[in-house]
Amino acid sequence: MRFSRVVSLVLLLVFTAVLTGAVKASLNDKPVGFASVPTADLPEGTVGGLGGEIVFVRTAEELEKYTTAEGKYVIVVDGTIVFEPKREIKVLSDKTIVGINDAKIVGGGLVIKDAQNVIIRNIHFEGFYMEDDPQGKKYDFDYINAENSHHIWIDHCTFVNGNDGAVDIKKYSNYITVSWCKFVDHDKVSLVGSSDKEDPEQAGQAYKVTYHHNYFKNCIQRMPRIRFGMAHVFNNFYSMGLRTGVSGNVFPIYGVASAMGAKVHVEGNYFMGYGAVMAEAGIAFLPTRIMGPVEGYLTLGEGDAKNKFYYCKEPETRPVEEGKPAFDPHEYYDYTLDPVDDVPKIVVDGAGAGKLVFEDLMSSK
């Protein structure tokens, strides 16, 4: 009976994947980008809680019990978890947090502090927008916040309109990949680097981050904004329109920004501004920006790695050395660019929560 039930579940899983265009996923999947880079303490790069106990959670209390437990865990968010009151919880090292059954975290955020080796996949985050604090000055809630942590992979998650950051990377965090995520109606999407006053030598060795195949829809700024470190931004789709249903900033301002000597390479991305009418009126989206009391470096891909810009302002760039990328990502990891003309369809179809089906979890449930 047990075998028959498992076979039936797997067949249902495959059939559902075919109908919905879902992607088969595994707990053994590896990230692309800086999260894959091996170090002495993590020779295989980011593997999360692989090999640890698999637990299914359905309440905020159950989720926090395992995110704050010592040791390896694969934590499966089954359905919707609502935090009341709204709050953030801590995530310790060696955790994989994945969602099934349209997993949502409502009114809750994850703080990865003084930790390493964390994976978060296939979860929809919402409910952190506070009407009395549209600029995030009072509550400072982030959906995901990494502080003094390394080797983190955030994949196939959706983030909807929070007060402060959707994914913020601070306090010298390092070796992080944000991939195949969807950001909707958010203002300050993703900040890398805590402040201009961080130690430049220490910060310059940290903050290695990859963003690839993400969908930024009607967001305002920081997609991402990087201080000090290195960021590789490739094959993302920026679809900029009016941010509706919220107070605060309404029109998108800029996409990728580099400050405080950061080295940022941007390639194979598709930037779509507000449209012809707005562009003709002089209101246009700035796809890349150089910022800060100390300017950063930012370069654009060439040839097959070119970006595409529609109804945008002229992108701002600043090379470290003329004719060369700000840094060469291939020196750190292997990756393959999708053709830029294919990016909108690939990313819209594939990014965000609810797109992954974990076959290796079916027999564990």
From Swiss-Prot:
Q: Please tell me where Ca(2+) binds in this chain.
A: 142, 164, 168
List GO terms (cellular component aspect): extracellular region
So what EC number does this one have? Answer: 4.2.2.22
PbH1 repeats (start-end) = 149-171, 261-287
MF terms (GO), sorted A to Z: metal ion binding; pectate lyase activity
Q: Which domain of life is it from?
A: Bacteria
User: Which residue positions does the secretion signal occupy?
Assistant: 1-25
Subcellular location(s) per record: Secreted
Q: List the disulfide bonds.
A: none
Q: Name one GO biological process term.
A: cell wall organization
The prosthetic group or cofactor this protein requires is:
Ca(2+)
Database matches in Pfam families: Pectate_lyase_4 (PF00544)
**Similarity comment: family membership:** Belongs to the polysaccharide lyase 1 family.
Q: What does this protein do?
A: Cleaves unsaturated trigalacturonate from pectin. Activity is highest towards polygalacturonic acid, activity on methylated pectins decreases with an increasing degree of methylation.
User: Which protein are we looking at?
Assistant: Pectate trisaccharide-lyase
What organism does the record attribute this protein to?
A: Thermotoga sp. (strain RQ2)
